[in-house]
Amino acid sequence: MPGSIVASLIFLLIPLTLLPRCGAADSITTYGVVPNKTCGGSGNFSSDGGIVFQMNLRQFLATLPSNVIKNGGSFNGSVGSTNAVFGMAMCQADLPWPDHCESYLQAATAEAPKACPSSFNTSVAYRGCVLRYWDAPVHADVADTQFYYFGVYKQEHAIQVVRDAAALNQTRKDLFENLSSEVVSSPLMIASGNRMFNSTHNLYGLAQCYRDWPKDLCSYYIRVVGGYFGYIDSQTWDGLSFASYAFYLRYSFF
């Protein structure tokens, strides 16, 4: 497992109570803005090639939200034959569908060029949606660290004290082990499930991968990151989620 993921799991903890509420599988979970951008591949946008790239980018971004909705929450495409734009976008599966997904992507497509005004390679995360574009094809199986993470959120309301941490960790690990197999069997690359814990708590888990991501990578990261939840989760947090540009996990009690 790349060290960058372990570091993020330990140090990048953002309380969900600071974020705007929107619906999910259970009524007490919140998701919202994660101020995140990565700008790369800066160049001369005033050159002939840069001007053509910007034209292609505007066309790609203008149709991206509707393309994501038509494609069930995930999209990968390109625009242009020369100085082409290649991009992808994904909405988290527990966003209210389709309104929130579409409106958040509309905001992301409007802000991405402003956030990285001279970049040919841009990654943006906004309210449970991710958007990325490049000036060349990018294969999901390359060593692209931007596919890995941008945030870990903890849920702090309706807190419950779990006294048997070892049993909780094992139950949660077993749940995500199972979801790591189920998610790659789903055409939408989404899976969810429940596990009883101590006969008193129902543990809900959700796993999602970017649909064009290789299935072996999807299964690997769902399994491994799900297992690492126990290293950062205290016994008083009621839930946790892990967001990246290629996969998303969350668990909560209900």
Regions found by a protein language model. Name each.
Residues P2-F254:
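Extracellular secretory-pathway ectodomains and N-terminal mature segments of eukaryotic proteins
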